[in-house]
Amino acid sequence: MRALGPGSVSSFLKTILDVVHYALWVLIGGALVFALVSLLFSFNPGLLADRVPFGERFAGLVERGPAFATVLVAGAAYMGGVLAIVDILRRIFVTLTAGDPFHPDNVRRLRLVGLIFGGLEIGRYILAAVLALMMTGQVRTVEGTLNLTTWFAVLVIFVLAEVFREGARLRNEAELTI
C-alpha cells in the first residue's frame, strides 16, 4: 500500500479528517447550546420547574450554572482549537494525496499546528485557575500537573516543520538542477 498519492494511506487519512472536521462542528454547536441553556436555567430556575421534575439530584446545578456554562464554553473553545488543527492537517494531507509532501506551505502549517497545540495546553492551565476561582471564590494555588507529553509533542511538531522546511529546500534545489 502506498503512502502518497490518490488511493493511498494519506487519502484515507484525509477522509477520516474530513469526518472529524464535521463532527467537531456539531460538537461545538451542541456545547454552545448547552452553555446557553445552563445559563438560562441558572438565571431563572423555575423556567421548566413545572414541566420537568428535576428532583434533589440537580439542585446544586442551579448554583453552579455559570461555572457549568464556563466549562462548556471553554470546551467549545478547546474543540475550536482542535478544529483548527484538523483543518490544517486536512490541507497538509491534500498535498500528501497529490504526491507533494514537501510543499512549502506545509512548513508554515506545521508550525501553526505546534502553536495552536501549545496554546490549547496553556488554555487548559488558565481554565483550571478560573474554575478554581469561580468554585471557591478565592484565589488559590491550582493543583495540576504539567503535561510533559503534550509539550514533547509540541516540540516534535516544530522539529517536523524544520524537517519539512529542509525537504522543501532540497526539492527546490532539485528543480533548479538541469
Feature-to-residue mapping (PLM):
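Alpha-helical transmembrane segments of polytopic integral membrane proteins
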Residues: 29, 33-36, 82, 86-90, ...
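Hydrophobic alpha-helical transmembrane segments of integral membrane proteins
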Residues: 99-133
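Perimembrane loop-to-helix junctions flanking transmembrane segments
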Residues: 46-64
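Short, Lys/Arg-rich, polar N-terminal cytosolic tail immediately upstream
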Residues: 1-12
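Alpha-helical transmembrane segments of multi-pass integral membrane proteins
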Residues: 119-178
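Membrane-helix interface/capping segments
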Residues: 2, 82-101
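Alpha-helical transmembrane segments and their helix-start/interface "positive-inside/aromatic belt" motifs
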Residues: 11-32
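Membrane-helix boundary elements
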Residues: 58-86
